[in-house]
Amino acid sequence: MVLKVCVIGLGILGKQYVTRLDGRPEVNVVGVADVIEARAREVGHPVGAKVYTDYVPMLREQRPDIAVIATPDPLHREPVLAAIEAGTPAIFQEKPMATTVADAEAMLDAAEKAGARIFVNYANRGSPLDRATHYVIQHGLLGQIVYGESHLDDHIAVPTRLWGNRTRSWVEGSSTAHFLLSHSVDFLRWVMAPAEVTEVFAISQRKVLTYTPDLYDAFLTFDNGAKFRVKAEWIKHIDGLVEFSLDFSGAEGSLRYNKVAGFAEVEGWRANLSATLDYRELLKHQGALAAQGVPVGALYHHVDPLADVVERAAGKPRASLEAFNVAKDGWRVVNSFVDAVLEETLTPSSWAHYGPLPSGIDGLRQTQVVGAIVESSEQGRVVEV
């Protein structure tokens, strides 16, 4: 079976969708649409796709199996609804699902009524150490998670130069809440499932960029009592484009994940596991992760920060898992979307251990949480989700 695909929006990510999906033998990119015709020709001609400047006739003429929506953050609703109206059975959407809850609800409602399926590309679920984090928390290897932090920051070049002369207009329609915290919120919902965010308190500021907030800094409370701080800014003068780190504190262990390292940091991942685990159980979990394509080292060692003070190491050895500089896979989630369509399931064989793939329901939940973050920052109060 060969799946017919149409791609709407050919900016930075839209172009990548075309080349990545066209590289799969089960996929044929039959149409591409962008308001800039020259760009559509540049992207579409090399893969033999028909070029359009209007996605409505493209969807009607091509009748694709999959429509990819890679338009700017606030412009997802209309192409998604058009794809559903044209009878497209599967829609791959870039995150965030929407910048308003009303848009997300409208898309999900239309999909459910039509029997269409929406997939939302939360790419930060796909890399090996993303999946290792999910494994450790879902298997209770840290005990109950009680607190955590996520810092996801961009260089100031992103809101000032990334999209060329269109940058300001693009950024005015989004923010670090939608552009960055959509990643953080979804990642936390995924690893903490089935727990859900129930309330939010947030702040923001506009001191550097006047046309969009400089940052959002929020506290999320989950229904199991866990609390997380999530912070995202895009006014940093850093060496790289992105810095991304996550911390999880459990009742029995802790996890640190430097996904995209900053100055004087190393990209890596360490989980100090519950003291109840012995070395046999440690090796079992290491083997299970290896079988899933996640290479982590196993340590069974004394960890006592007071050893130099009291001149002795207390307690029994501690089980830990760690990894450094593991290659990322930013397209694993999208590839699993294709597998899901082929296998007609939300849990295809390529995503067997990580729960259902992110769908329109996840998109709505993420949009609700981010919407609460924005509302809380504007009103200066706790907002229930």
Where do the language-model regions lie?
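Rossmann-fold dehydrogenase core element
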Residues: 104-124, 144-148
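Aromatic/hydrophobic pocket-lining residues that form π-stacking "cages" and hydrophobic walls in ligand
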Residues: 40, 79, 107, 133, ...
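Contiguous beta-strand/loop segments that form the cofactor/metal-binding neighborhood of enzyme cores
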Residues: 179, 183-280, 285-295, 302, ...
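Predominantly a Rossmann-like dinucleotide-binding segment in NAD(P)-dependent oxidoreductases
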Residues: 124-210, 227, 236, 380
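N-terminal Rossmann-like dinucleotide-binding module
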Residues: 1-47
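Hydrophobic residues in well-ordered beta-strands that form the structural core
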Residues: 53, 69, 92-93, 118-120, ...
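Beta-loop-alpha module in the N-terminal Rossmann-like domain of NAD(P)-dependent dehydrogenases
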Residues: 17, 50-110
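C-terminal helix-rich "cap/oligomerization" subdomain common to oxidoreductases
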Residues: 66-68, 310-385
